[in-house]
């Protein structure tokens, strides 16, 4: 019985380790601190680029995700005509 429980627990850990973790946050501002930062369709470099934001510009983040690679990504509020996009928060400074 104990072996079965250990197997089930291990399988659950493996599945959970591959999921993104969503953090609902109060909207906050970030300043871009790299030359040109790609904006993507989802919270990972694996997603298509939908645009880019320039250094020193400020944007509002409305949601955070820690992806399966451990990177923290932020969802931009109303990026380019009401379309939201994701940026890697590693290249930003919280204001």
Model-derived features: positions:
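Extracellular/lumenal glycan-associated surfaces
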Residues: 37, 41, 79
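SH3-family beta-barrel domains
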Residues: 1-38, 51-55, 64-65, 93-95
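Short alpha-helix capping/helix-loop boundary micro-motifs
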Residues: 43-48
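SH3/SH3-like beta-barrel superfamily modules
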Residues: 4, 52-93
